[in-house]
Each structure stands twice: as structure tokens, then as C-alpha cells.
Curated annotation (Swiss-Prot):
Its main location: membrane. It catalyses: heme b + (2E,6E)-farnesyl diphosphate + H2O = Fe(II)-heme o + diphosphate. It is found in: Cell inner membrane. Belongs to the UbiA prenyltransferase family. Protoheme IX farnesyltransferase subfamily. The lineage of its organism: Bacteria, Pseudomonadati, Pseudomonadota, Gammaproteobacteria, Pseudomonadales. It comes from the Bacteria. Its EC number is 2.5.1.141. GO terms for molecular function: protoheme IX farnesyltransferase activity. The chain crosses the membrane at residues 9-29, 36-56, 80-100, 108-128, 135-155, 163-183, 209-229, 230-250, 265-285. This is Protoheme IX farnesyltransferase. The keyword Ligase does not apply. It comes from Pseudomonas savastanoi pv. phaseolicola (strain 1448A / Race 6). It is a multi-pass membrane protein. Pathway: Porphyrin-containing compound metabolism; heme O biosynthesis; heme O from protoheme: step 1/1.
Amino acid sequence: MSLKHFIQITKPGIIFGNVLSVAGGFFLASKGNIDFGVFLAAVIGTSLVVASGCVFNNCIDRDIDQRMERTRNRVLVQGLVSLKLALLYATILGVAGVALLYTEANPLAALFAVIGFVIYVGLYSLYLKRRSVHGTLVGSLSGAMPPVIGYCAVTNSFDFAALTLLVMFSLWQMPHSYAIAIFRFNDYRAAKIPVLPVKRGILVTKRHIMLYILAFLVATLMLTVGGYAGLNYLAVAAGMGMYWLYMAWKGYKAVDDTVWARKLFVFSIFTITALSVMMSVDFQVTKELLVTYAF
């Protein structure tokens, strides 16, 4: 047991991805008027809650991870950290994260962190992941919470932009997750996890991917239509979304579904990263805020 093992069970890669989306939501709401104290609270608080959820997920999925090639060497599967200690660690991380958001951001940001945690750990990890093909859809809601937390940390309100972020990031999760399920098909089948490719086939999954990317593309444009993001953001969102849709369409003619799915997965990360960056820098400044800057 070492510090490295405690870091590994928090899934740092997932935390980093969520930091980008928290920052995107925060800077979109800030419109250039940044409170760095609140920003740090939003980023660190969300990271702690996400880390907590990942540790709990590792605890819950020990039996599944034993049956999957890519996860059978995880820390808890190998017994490098005890279950009791991991559960205590996860609890401390979660409580600390929510407390930080509540005290240094606002109660609404903390509430969305709790909602995301409950969905991911309670609904998805404990129940739906093992029992329903719709587990991915429910789990996508938890993955969409970080940008909403970042946004609400600034505004302390759930408005059209916050709703758009929730819808955008939920829709993005679906083709992203389905791509993983395709190129990790054998692992999911061996672990008896009822993801869409395993339950209904890869062709059906490709159709779902197309529909979700199309819906995601439309949702991304709503930030500009609603007056929250600028035209540069719109251009990037439209371009990335349409190319992602084109890549999905090419899947119908793919010779190797595994190779195609990996490419689709990688581009999904590029897409959401680009949009998080663009909404951070190409926001719409209201007349009221311009007056604030002027004086």
C-alpha cells in the first residue's frame, strides 16, 4: 500500500477531464469577471467529489473488474488497499468536496455535486450498470454535472445556459461511452454488463451513436442562440460536431469496428475539450457587465 495506490483508485484521468468541464462552465458564467477563490473552490471541490465517486465505484465493481482484462490489475482487485480503508477514504473525499463547494462557492453548486454523486454511485454503479441497458443513459447525467457545478458556482442559479450544459454533456457521454463499449466489447460481455452493443448488437449501437451526436450538435449551438457564447464558439461547435457526425456515419462502412470505435472515442475527447475551451474564452458579455468593466 502506497500513496500511488490511493491516487490510482481516484482515476486521475477522469478527474482531469472533469476539471476541464468545470472550468468551461465557470468561465462561461464569469464572462471575464473571475473570482479566483471561487474558481479554485469549484475545481477542487468538484475534483474531490468526482474522486470520491470513482473510489466508491472501484469498491462496488471489484467482482466485475476481476473479469475484465483492462481492470483486473486495479488496486482493489489486487488487494493493495483494503475495502474498509478505501470506503473511509472515499467518504472523506466526498464530504470534503461537498463542504468546500457549500462554504466557498454556494449551496446550489454543492447540491448538483451531491446529485451527480448519488446518480453515479447509487443509481448507476450499485444498480443499473449490472441490470439495465439504460444504465449508460442514467450514468450520463452524473457525467454532465461538473460544468453545471462550475456555472452555478458563479451564478447561483439554474438558468437556460445551465440546462444547456447539462443536456450537452449528457448527450456527449452517450456516443463516447458506446464507442468504449464497442472497442471493449469482449470485456463487457465477459463481465456480463448489459451495455447496448452486447445486448442489442453493434449495428443498433451505431444508429444510436448517430442520433446522439446529431442531438449533441444541436444542443451545443444553443449556447450561442441563447446569447451565452459567441460566434467563434459557434463555428468550432458546428465544425467539430459535424465532423464527429461524419466519423459516426463512416462506421456503417467500417472494416474493423474496433479501430473505428477507438477513433470515434478519441475524437469525442477532442470535441468536448475544444468546446470547454471555447466557451471559456468566447462568451457573450451583457450590457450590464460592460458598464461594470467601464467603471
